[in-house]
Amino acid sequence: MNAPHHPAHSTVRTKKLPPLRVGVGGPVGSGKTTLLEMLCKAMREQYDLVAITNDIYTKEDQRLLTVAGALPAERIMGVETGGCPHTAIREDASINLEAVDRMLTRFPDADIVFIESGGDNLAATFSPELSDLTIYVIDVAGGEKIPRKGGPGITKSDLLVINKTDLAPMVGANLEVMAADAKKMRGERPFVMCNLKALDGLDVVVKFIEKKGLLKV
C-alpha cells in the first residue's frame, strides 16, 4: 500500500507549537528501522511527519523506509555520517541538525521529525539539542542479559522498547527476567515489550509519543 498523498506546504510554519523531534536509537539489528516504519504508517494519517535516517557509509535505511512506503520519498532523508554513529547524534550533531533544518524548510508544518541513529552500542544517546524524546530499541535475540548491562540508552531513554519477544523461546530468554531487569535499571522510566513485526506493542509506543510529546491534550 502506498503512503498517502500529502498536499504541498508553504515555506512558513502556520502551527503554534514547534515540531516534536523523536530520536530512535539502539544496536544494529534491534529493529529501529522497523519501529520507524510502523510508527510512520500508524501516525501519518493524523500527523504531518518527516523522517531522517543515519547510516555510516550508505543510505540503506532511507531506501528501506521508502520501499516500504512508510512516507512519500521526499519526506525521508538519509544522512551518511562517515564515522561513529553516536558522534553524529551526540558529540557533534551538526550534520543531523542541518538535516532537520532542511526538512523543516521543505515541510514547515511538520508535527513530528523522527531521527533514527545508526546502529551503535549501549552507550549511545541523543543530544538534547537534537531530540526532544528518545526511544531506545533492544531485542531479545541479543540475550536475556541485555537490560541489566545498563548504559545510557537503557537507563536514560524516555522509552525503552524490548523488541522481538517472539524469539524468546528460540534463544532461551526469559521475558519476565528481562522485564524485571529493565524495571530495576530504569526505575520509574517506562519500557514496553514488543513484537514489532506483528505490531504487538506498537500502540503503546504511539500513545507514549502522543502523551509525552503533548500532541494530545
UniProtKB/Swiss-Prot annotation:
Oligomer and partners: Homodimer. UreD, UreF and UreG form a complex that acts as a GTP-hydrolysis-dependent molecular chaperone, activating the urease apoprotein by helping to assemble the nickel containing metallocenter of UreC. The UreE protein probably delivers the nickel.
Domain of life of the native organism: Bacteria
GO term, biological process aspect, one: urea catabolic process
Family to which the UniProt record says this protein belongs: Belongs to the SIMIBI class G3E GTPase family. UreG subfamily.
Location of this chain's protein in the cell: Cytoplasm
Region Disordered, annotated ranges: 1-24
Protein name: Urease accessory protein UreG
UniProt GO cellular component terms: cytoplasm
Residues binding GTP: G26, P27, V28, G29, S30, G31, K32, T33
Composition skew (Basic residues), residue ranges: 1-18
Pfam family, one: cobW
PANTHER family the record matches: UREASE ACCESSORY PROTEIN G (PTHR31715:SF0)
Protein's UniProt keywords contain Disulfide bond: no
Function field: Facilitates the functional incorporation of the urease nickel metallocenter. This process requires GTP hydrolysis, probably effectuated by UreG.
Provenance organism: Paraburkholderia xenovorans (strain LB400)
Keywords from the UniProt entry: Chaperone, Cytoplasm, GTP-binding, Nickel insertion, Nucleotide-binding
Cross-referenced CDD domains: UreG
InterPro entries linked: CobW/HypB/UreG_nucleotide-bd, P-loop_NTPase, UreG
GO molecular function, one term: GTPase activity
